[in-house]
Every structure is written in C-alpha cells, then in structure tokens.
Amino acid sequence: MLINAARLLLPAAALVHLSLAWATSDRCNGYSSTLIQIKHAGDIYKQPSVPGLPPPGVNPYSLIDTLLKNGEDWCKHCASPRVSVDAGRYKAQMDKLLSYAHPYSASSWDSVQSLGDALEHLCKASRKEN
C-alpha cells in the first residue's frame, strides 16, 4: 500500500516541481497549466475502458505542439535559467526533438517531468550567442 501511494505521489511531485519553477508570472503559470493538461489528457488516453478514443476536446499532442511553438517565449521568461534563443537554432532543435532521434525526443516523453526536461534542454541548446 505504501509503494502504491509513493507511485501516485511521484507524478504529483514532478508537477509541483515544475509549477514552482515556472510560477513567476501569469505567463509561466499558463505554461505550467498546459503541462498539467497534457498530463491529464495523457492519463485519460491510457484508460483501458475506451481504447483508441480520445477524450472530447482534449488532445495532448495539440497542447504539446502549442507549447513548443511558444517555446521561445517560455525560454525567455520561464526557463531555468532564462535565456534568449536564436529563432533559427530553436526551430532546428525543435525539429530534432520531434524527429525521435534525440535523447530528449518526443519518444521519451513519458511524463510531465521528461517533457519539462526536454523543454529545458531545448532552451539551452538554442541559446543566442553573445
């Protein structure tokens, strides 16, 4: 029973960690909220009762796409550390993440924490050179 409770707390702890890291403004709270929606939508998708049917009005892939497309703003205002990114480098790095041939690629996004780690990496890898 204790092990099951710990399993339930790990995703919650990851969400709290990300929420605290990004809770510096309404903008960052919006990104944090989007990640929570992605997590919730992913949980719904995994329910065995209705295999293959997405929940009405919620698409985690659409939310991830929106998050990535606004990632330059996220990097500048919410990432740790906050960085300005080069738009071309950001696009190239984002394409790598979505290519499934990268250590932080979409194929490894099995939790909100791993998605957050990928976003942090994306910001660092596309940072503007001075």
Curated annotation (Swiss-Prot):
Principal localisation: secreted
Disruption phenotype: Greatly attenuates U.virens virulence to rice.
Keyword Signal attached: yes
Subcellular localization: Secreted; Host cell; Host periplasm
Induction data: Expression is up-regulated during U.virens plant infection.
Record's signal peptide: 1-23
Region described as Plant immunity suppression domain: 68-85
Keyword annotations: Host periplasm, Secreted, Signal, Virulence
GO cellular component, one term: host cell periplasmic space
Domain of life: Eukaryota
Function: Secreted effector required for full virulence of U.virens. Inhibits host pathogen-associated molecular pattern-triggered immunity including flg22- and chitin-induced defense gene expression and oxidative burst.
Domain notes: The Plant immunity suppression domain is sufficient to retain the ability to suppress immunity-associated responses.
Protein's UniProt name: Secreted cysteine-rich effector 2
Annotated gene: SCRE2
